[in-house]
UniProtKB/Swiss-Prot annotation:
This is 3-isopropylmalate dehydratase large subunit. [4Fe-4S] cluster binds at C262, C320, C323. Heterodimer of LeuC and LeuD. PROSITE patterns: ACONITASE_1, ACONITASE_2. The lineage of its organism: Archaea, Methanobacteriati, Methanobacteriota, Thermococci, Thermococcales. It is an enzyme of class 4 (lyase). Its EC number is 4.2.1.33. Transmembrane segments: none annotated. It comes from Pyrococcus horikoshii (strain ATCC 700860 / DSM 12428 / JCM 9974 / NBRC 100139 / OT-3).
Length: 380
């Protein structure tokens, strides 16, 4: 059986109804969830959490009023609200909520991040999340699974983001709709494992999980992925599937670098960027977005905040930052950013004429020093 089949206790293609162990949403999706919930339900029957991470603190009166509405709804229904502590997917991990769960539904497309912990986690739209809140359960068609088996070890300049840009690019002509990605023989750290499952959504995967031993049964596709020969990658505008070796875009001038997000804002990511920036000065706007308060505190304890500030970087409060183009570093017309986020669609981080290149924290940090896309090969 695949990992998905084991958790859902059903074969791929079957339609099942399952209890949901945890449902969560954030300030960006919760208003529509509340609207749908109030049309049908009077009480919450699910274990639920709300996180303020997308546009926090509120930058406008409109956003402030929406957040006020969320607080009032949560108070009425006894739902904990976590404000200003970081990105929802990171906090669910840090708070131990994922460890106590088998099936998780989130009001965000990157909920499958939790699959790094062996959880069947899926993002759903507002109506489906509202139903989970009201019933404590959901229906699912058990997805088929694609197995990714890693071979070899990554080089010192290769990070999980490089792996995923290459994998997503290789799958762009393969129909991943409503299929799961399952990773085996994974040589990455806990922080980097979360990058693998988080980025899987950009391959159009329904969810993603990390397993231990690959048994080869019931998988519709098997991908052997050699790590030792993989170098730094960059995804060109305007798709994460536009991946190329960094050398092919080296020298591209950039206006801004963003290192953070639910993809690459964990401690290891920022520490490795700081190792590059130590004693140097950035050549372009460089924004650092810790994924959580705990990440930020550790940055303070280990002197990383001083390194980044001395290098000329701007450190944001924990949260999503400019990833979704709402505040704290949005792009102007025709500006170019090198970002460690997971999406580079037109207009994603601000102006629709801006260009977004995606890369690992290492590539982003080195590029910040030179003001152009640069391979980290000689700097690490």
């Amino acid at each position: 059986m695949t990992l998905v089949e084991e958790i859902l206790d059903a074969k791929a293609g079957e339609v099942v109804i399952r209890n949901v162990d945890l449902v969560y949403a954030h300030d960006g999706t919760m208003p529509l969830i509340i609207e749908a919930f109030n049309k049908v339900f009077n009480s919450v029957k699910a274990r639920a959490y709300v996180f303020f991470d997308h546009v926090y603190p509120a930058p406008t009166v409109k956003v402030a009023n929406l957040q006020k509405e969320i607080r009032e709804f949560a108070r009425r229904h006894g739902i904990p609200v976590v404000e200003g502590k970081g990105i929802s997917h990171q906090l669910v991990v840090e708070m131990g909520l994922a460890e106590k769960s088998r099936i998780v539904v989130g009001g965000d497309s990157h909920t499958p991040t939790l699959g790094a912990l062996g959880v069947f986690a899926v993002g759903m739209g507002a109506t489906d999340v509202a139903v989970v809140l009201g019933l404590g359960k959901t229906w699912l068609r058990v997805p088929e699974s694609v197995a990714v088996i890693f071979e070899g070890k990554p080089s010192r300049t290769t990070m999980a983001a490089d792996v995923m840009i290459r994998l997503i690019t290789s799958l762009r002509n393969y129909d991943m709709n409503y299929k799961a990605l399952e990773f085996f023989n994974v040589p990455f750290t806990a922080d980097e494992r979360l990058t693998l499952t988080n980025f899987s959504v950009e391959a159009n995967a329904k969810t993603a999980l990390i397993g231990e031993e690959y048994d080869g049964r019931n998988y519709i596709k098997e991908i052997s992925f050699e790590l030792s020969s993989l170098g730094p990658m960059v995804a060109k505008p305007f798709s994460p599937a536009n991946g190329v070796e960094v050398e092919k875009v080296e020298g591209t001038k950039i206006d801004q670098v963003f290192i953070g997000s639910c993809t690459n804002g964990r401690f290891e990511h920022i520490k490795r960027a700081a190792e590059i920036l130590k004693g140097e000065e950035v050549a372009v706007r460089t924004i650092i977005g810790p994924a959580s308060v705990n990440v930020y505190k550790r940055m303070v304890r280990e002197g990383i905040v001083d390194i980044l500030l001395d290098a000329g970087a701007t450190i944001l409060p924990p949260g999503c930052g400019p990833c979704l183009g709402r505040h704290m570093g949005v792009l102007g017309d025709k500006e170019v950013v090198l970002s460690t986020t997971n999406r580079n669609f037109r207009g994603r981080m601000g102006s629709p004429t801006a260009e977004i290149y995606l890369a690992s924290p290492l590539t982003a940090a080195v590029s910040a020093l030179y003001g152009e896309i640069t391979s980290p090969g000689g700097e690490v």
